[in-house]
């Protein structure tokens, strides 16, 4: 369902080196990425719909006719939609109008705690059994079985790999248990405290602390800043089960519940199952009160500075108004679209500034957003270098005032309309093959704002009615009206103190507002210059791989094309271009500049820059990404069927005529200057930075760039490493999706097939394919972070082997990893309650000779690290010496097999698996073998794999602790 336009067209590309990314850097983890837009209104309480009523009953917006909406006599609503593609899959969501805003002072954090208790015992399902029951039906914990708590809702999620009666009935039974039958026993609550506290530790990042402070600054005295979903540590540590049970009975009630089921089933039969399972549900005790969210108070221009050493420099200028509580109506949606187009134009201007030769900031966006029905805000957001905030603030303020004073131009508006129309048309074309989880999440996402669930075709129709005859003056007026309200309020987070603090920020803002702004200049005319690459190439050879519905093609210039037509997603076509040998072509002893890959795309093409490319191709759906893979330099993109020729033109132009503009490289380099400071702020950031280099024994192709590497990097070095391979190495094109073989051949023949012949593929020297694994250590390698004193990570890895050494052994190792994951969860999360997210990962390389691993990791307080290493060693020993049970084997294998089967009906799976298959037919054999090979793994195979690889004297251990812990101890 279309709700808003993209904010900041190239922002992700500009800021790819920021950590943890722009949204988190400005402290917006809880704001929607595509904010809902509306008009301000007088303060009022958010009115819930009467029990059992859907929004369309009070709206003129047509509801999706393919969704069966209903309600039970007890007030519980349900929405059912048949989605037959992919076959045999379904998604179930149970949403409660119950979040942290409903908590009392003594219950802060208990809405989320209750979500955890849903997996810890009910009247008919013993503690610890719910997840195991689902695993036996192929649902993996975390991936297919999950839940989330927000300010105003709690949602339970099941993604079903099968829709047989047993799986569906079991899933509905467990949802019913969650709704009304939880036991919330004392022992279970006490065990779960450590898990919830672990989640609190893990979530307390620099970006989250920025978010908390900013929310409190924007909404002082209101309930939302006082009811963050994670809650208060003292409540989590001490709250009795009775307080959790009180919240449960007050807010988990039929009239506050909505069940959404989407998938491959008969809707009438599903409706009967829902009625049979939920009709007798009755609420217990009195209903809980609706929270008083508070009022937006009158305020003048104010500023607040937060010094957060591990955060990026971010600044927001915000106007705050009472929330928009108007009903969802066609007129409102049309006005929202007009307003969103206005913001899209402004954000496009910010993008152009960020791409300029002397960019005043790293990135900036503007939007309006609802804040939990507590307020509506208009925000100007920017990220800049710490010493450049004044220049950045001036640029954002002046560009906003320029847009408000002089308005938007018709050509700017028409461009945004064309882009939204193209993406909306693609959404309509692909509607029949959306995934059940996507549709279910969209329906759930509409409930909090009481919006009508609409079909993509209706969204497009509303959009077209809104933009028909739309003039720039109307959009300009909407933009001007959006910048109103209390304030503006200026919030800055900085990694270091700012001289003069808040008074200096206010003075700078006042100063820039005195600067007169001139009208914007109209852009120059431009045309797409890469429609022809010469005489189309001729097909030299064609080979059909009939059992995989795949065709191999070789052109006379040596370019290879692999095509797999599918109907997994209507109107979706994925393209990947593999050139040369990637990391294998780079030196082992010098820092690779592959991490500057975004600068390659942002650098544009010789005949047209990236900004103009986006403008001239606004009506097309295309993509361009660049990466240095282990076995190829990779260009990739996604498109719709009609735009495949354009997609191929774009990718061919990047290979044959890249622009290598220095501005893009410098922006990337500038963003990287504070990257180490940001990553050192959490244990997760440190391990993210260090792990790849450590697991490859210091091979510079895999190490993260040092501060010095970033500072001294030169565009010429990147160009020297990459350009010769792009210009001369063999090319393989893989196309998967809603396309015919003939159309794929035609598009490639006119682009890559028309290029001059490339040199023949050469074997990679054995020394370049050899990567070492780190030597075992008796004591963990200790790394430090600068975050909270109670945050630490433990990590253990054992070397295994590459895939081709023994493909069946690799699958045995995968199942071994799944069994170890089950045992880590049982021991560290369920039995000890010391961590939220123990995990096991494994890899068997298709590229590096002899390289593979199986690893276990955990986030715990530092004092628990030794216990983790002991527990992992014991689990490894048990796996070496004792047989796994039949139940464990089933719970390990079935979710993995079901995951593989689900993956095989996606275009992404085949794009990855078919890459390189023409040069290495073993990849085809492994595609055929992976599911039957996993099915045949036995308990004896798992034990043998553990004996081969889980040896104490081979284990490589790593720990990330808070800086200064040993000195403090």
Give the location of each predicted region.
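Bacterial N-terminal signal peptides that target proteins for export
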Residues: 1-10
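C-terminal segment of classical bacterial N-terminal signal peptides
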Residues: 15-24
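Proteolytic maturation boundary segments
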Residues: 25-80, 266-339, 343-351, 355, ...
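M16 family metallopeptidases and their MPP-like homologs
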Residues: 79, 86-105, 109-111, 128-177, ...
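Non-catalytic, conformational "gating/processing" segments within enzyme and secreted inhibitor domains
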Residues: 181, 186, 193-194, 244-275, ...
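Hydrophobic, small-residue-rich alpha-helical packing segments that form membrane-like cores
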Residues: 188, 193-202, 206-255, 260-274, ...
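Alpha-helical scaffold elements lining the catalytic groove of polysaccharide deacetylases
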Residues: 236-240, 244, 710-713, 718, ...
């Amino acid at each position: 369902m279309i709700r808003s336009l993209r904010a900041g067209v190239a922002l992700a590309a500009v800021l790819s080196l920021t950590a943890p990314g722009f949204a988190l850097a400005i402290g917006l983890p809880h704001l929607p990425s595509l904010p809902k837009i509306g008009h301000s209104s007088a303060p009022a309480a958010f009115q819930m719909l009467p029990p059992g009523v859907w929004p369309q009953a009070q709206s003129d917006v047509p509801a999706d006719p393919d969704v069966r909406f209903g309600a039970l006599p007890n007030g519980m609503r349900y929405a059912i939609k048949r989605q037959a593609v992919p076959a045999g899959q379904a998604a179930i969501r149970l949403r409660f109008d119950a979040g942290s805003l409903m908590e009392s002072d003594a219950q802060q954090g208990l809405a989320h705690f209750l979500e955890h208790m849903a997996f810890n015992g009910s009247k008919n399902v013993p503690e610890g059994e719910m997840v195991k029951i689902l695993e036996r039906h192929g649902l993996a914990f975390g991936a297919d079985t999950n839940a989330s708590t927000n300010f105003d809702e709690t949602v339970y999620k099941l993604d079903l790999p099968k829709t047989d009666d047993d799986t569906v009935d079991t899933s509905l039974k467990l949802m019913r248990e969650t709704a009304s039958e939880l036991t919330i026993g004392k022992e279970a609550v006490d065990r779960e405290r450590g898990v919830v506290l672990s989640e609190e530790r893990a979530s307390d990042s620099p970006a989250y602390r920025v978010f908390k402070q900013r929310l409190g600054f924007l909404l002082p005295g209101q309930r939302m800043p006082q009811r963050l979903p994670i809650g208060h540590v003292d409540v989590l540590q001490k709250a009795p089960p009775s307080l959790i049970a009180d919240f449960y009975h007050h807010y988990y009630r039929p009239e506050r519940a909505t069940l959404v089921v989407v998938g491959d089933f008969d809707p009438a039969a599903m409706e009967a199952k829902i009625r049979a399972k939920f009709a007798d549900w009755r609420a217990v005790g009195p209903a809980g009160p609706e929270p008083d969210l508070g009022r937006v108070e009158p305020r003048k221009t104010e500023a607040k500075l937060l010094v957060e050493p591990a955060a990026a420099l971010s600044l927001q200028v915000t106007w705050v108004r009472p929330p928009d509580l108007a009903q969802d109506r066609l007129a409102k949606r049309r006005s929202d679209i007009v307003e969103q187009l206005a913001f899209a134009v402004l954000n496009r201007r910010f993008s152009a500034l960020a791409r300029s030769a002397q960019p005043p900031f790293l990135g900036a966006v503007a939007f309006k957003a609802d804040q939990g029905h507590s307020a509506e805000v208009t925000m100007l957001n920017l990220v800049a270098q710490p010493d450049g905030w004044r220049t950045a603030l001036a640029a954002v303020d002046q560009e906003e005032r320029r847009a408000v004073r002089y308005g938007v131009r018709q050509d700017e508006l028409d461009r945004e309309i064309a882009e939204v129309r193209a993406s909306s048309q693609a959404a309509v074309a692909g509607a029949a093959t959306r995934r059940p989880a996507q549709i279910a999440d969209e329906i759930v996402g509409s409930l909090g704002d009481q919006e009508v669930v609409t079909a993509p075709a209706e969204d497009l129709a509303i959009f077209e009615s809104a933009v028909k005859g739309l003039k720039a003056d109307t959009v300009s007026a909407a933009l001007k009206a959006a910048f109103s309200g209390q304030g503006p309020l200026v919030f800055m987070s900085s990694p270091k103190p700012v001289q003069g603090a808040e008074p200096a920020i206010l003075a700078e803002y006042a100063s820039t507002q005195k600067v007169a702004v001139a009208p914007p200049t109209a852009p120059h005319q431009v045309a797409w210059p890469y429609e022809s690459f010469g005489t189309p190439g001729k097909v030299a050879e064609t080979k059909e791989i009939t059992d995989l519905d795949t065709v191999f093609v070789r052109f006379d210039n040596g370019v290879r094309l692999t095509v797999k037509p599918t109907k997994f997603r209507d109107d979706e076509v994925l393209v990947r271009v593999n050139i040369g040998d990637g990391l294998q072509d780079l030196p082992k002893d010098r820092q690779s500049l592959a991490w500057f890959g975004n600068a390659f795309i942002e650098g544009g093409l010789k005949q047209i820059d990236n900004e103009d490319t986006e403008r001239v191709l606004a009506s097309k759906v295309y993509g361009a990404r660049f990466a240095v893979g282990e076995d190829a330099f990779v260009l990739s993109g996604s498109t719709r069927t009609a735009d495949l020729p354009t997609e191929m033109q774009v990718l061919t132009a990047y290979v044959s005529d890249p622009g290598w503009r220095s501005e893009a490289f410098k922006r990337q380099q500038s963003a990287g200057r504070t990257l180490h400071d940001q990553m050192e702020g959490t244990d997760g950031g440190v391990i993210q930075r260090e792990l790849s280099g450590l697991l490859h024994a210091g091979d510079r192709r895999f190490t993260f760039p040092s501060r010095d590497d970033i500072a001294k990097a030169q565009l010429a070095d990147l160009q020297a490493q990459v350009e010769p391979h792009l210009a001369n190495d063999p090319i393989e094109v893989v196309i998967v999706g809603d396309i015919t073989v003939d159309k794929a051949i035609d598009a490639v023949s006119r682009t890559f097939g028309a290029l001059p012949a490339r040199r023949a593929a050469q074997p990679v020297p054995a020394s370049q394919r050899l990567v070492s694994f780190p030597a075992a250590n008796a004591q963990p390698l200790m790394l430090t972070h600068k975050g909270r004193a109670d945050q630490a990570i433990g990590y253990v890895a054992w070397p295994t082997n590459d895939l081709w050494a023994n493909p069946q052994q690799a699958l045995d190792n995968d199942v071994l990893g799944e069994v170890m994951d089950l045992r880590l969860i049982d021991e560290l999360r369920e039995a000890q309650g010391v961590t939220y997210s123990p995990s096991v990962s494994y890899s068997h390389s298709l590229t590096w000779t002899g390289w593979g691993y199986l690893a276990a990791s955990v986030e715990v307080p530092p004092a628990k690290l030794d216990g983790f290493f002991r527990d992992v060693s014991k689990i490894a020993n048990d796996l070496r010496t004792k047989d796994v049970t039949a139940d464990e084997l089933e719970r390990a294998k079935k979710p993995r097999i079901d995951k593989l089967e689900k993956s095989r009906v996606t275009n992404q799976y085949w794009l990855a698996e078919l890459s390189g298959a023409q040069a290495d037919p073993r990849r085809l054999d492994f595609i055929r073998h992976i599911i039957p090979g996993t099915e045949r793994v036995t308990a004896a195979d798992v034990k043998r794999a553990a004996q081969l690889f889980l040896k104490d004297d081979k284990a490589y251990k790593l720990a990330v602790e808070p800086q200064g812990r040993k000195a403090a101890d």
